[in-house]
Amino acid sequence: KTIPKIRQLVEALCTSYGAPVSSSLINGAMVNHDPINAAPGGGIHGKGPEAFAAKTNTGQRLFSFPSPKELSRASLDELKELKLGYRAKYIYQLCQDAVSGALDLALLDTMDYGTALGYLTGFYGIGKKVANCVCLFGLHHIGAFPVDTWIEKILMAQYYDKRKYRRTPKTCLCDTIVKDVFGQYGGCAGVMQQYIFYYERLRNSKLS
């Protein structure tokens, strides 16, 4: 998905199932809250407001990102109506898991990177890339290095050495390159991932 399209999908979730948010809450301080039930949302850590604006006949309204409990009230068909595509079934099941306690978000917040990565990939719909995104952006494990289509292209174009990696299986090629190239940054590989992603997108004038 393109970045604008992803924004549209997130906004659809917020406006459909999030709670209205006062602009004073966005500008003021937020206290920590229960990640399962509380709204407005603030990521896994619950340390700040996450809100999206929706244009209405009376101007702009702000909506929180829905908590798992709020989103679990949506049926699978209702989620599909938001044009989430194949993601709808994953979102539906993960919200059910979070509300039931099978997916323990509070426990996840206490885990180290390796433990969190293994825990997340044990749930339906969460692969290694998404788990690494959660670890990097939601849990602040800055050693996490998500590899999506864009990052894979960058790795192959800028860091792939045919002679060095000629015997490396394709299934672990990107992981091997990441370890060799970015393992030298002392657990900050995720920071470097953001730099190379931004640079490549900016160089190709595709940031939006």
Model-based region annotation:
Residues 1-208:
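HhH-family (HhH-GPD) DNA N-glycosylase catalytic core used in base-excision repair
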